[in-house]
């Protein structure tokens, strides 16, 4: 029987085999811990992070979904400042639900296309 972490890592490996960020369309990846949420826009051809945002930068007491939405807005703004309009969304093995969905929707509303 596999644990939740083993299941997520197995899904992550399968997704990362299919998804790769390019210079024209970098990868927007998300990491979720119990308390924080992080997002990065990565160009996999050079291995460089073009933009990053996390809930650590926010000094807001709010529900986790609202904080995830604010991180989505921040990553969209940072990506546009780096000259990125379209991305490939990498949910990193997490279900597209809850905080991950809120972050993705906020990034879309912020102007990113994926």
UniProtKB/Swiss-Prot annotation:
Molecular function (Gene Ontology), one example: structural constituent of ribosome
Entry-linked Pfam families: Ribosomal_L18p
BP-aspect Gene Ontology terms: translation
Keyword Isomerase attributed: no
Keywords: Ribonucleoprotein, Ribosomal protein, RNA-binding, rRNA-binding
GO cellular component terms, A-Z: cytosolic large ribosomal subunit
Subunit (UniProt): Part of the 50S ribosomal subunit; part of the 5S rRNA/L5/L18/L25 subcomplex. Contacts the 5S and 23S rRNAs.
Function: This is one of the proteins that bind and probably mediate the attachment of the 5S RNA into the large ribosomal subunit, where it forms part of the central protuberance.
HAMAP family xref list: Ribosomal_uL18_B
Family (UniProt): Belongs to the universal ribosomal protein uL18 family.
Protein name per the record: Large ribosomal subunit protein uL18
Organism: Parabacteroides distasonis (strain ATCC 8503 / DSM 20701 / CIP 104284 / JCM 5825 / NCTC 11152)
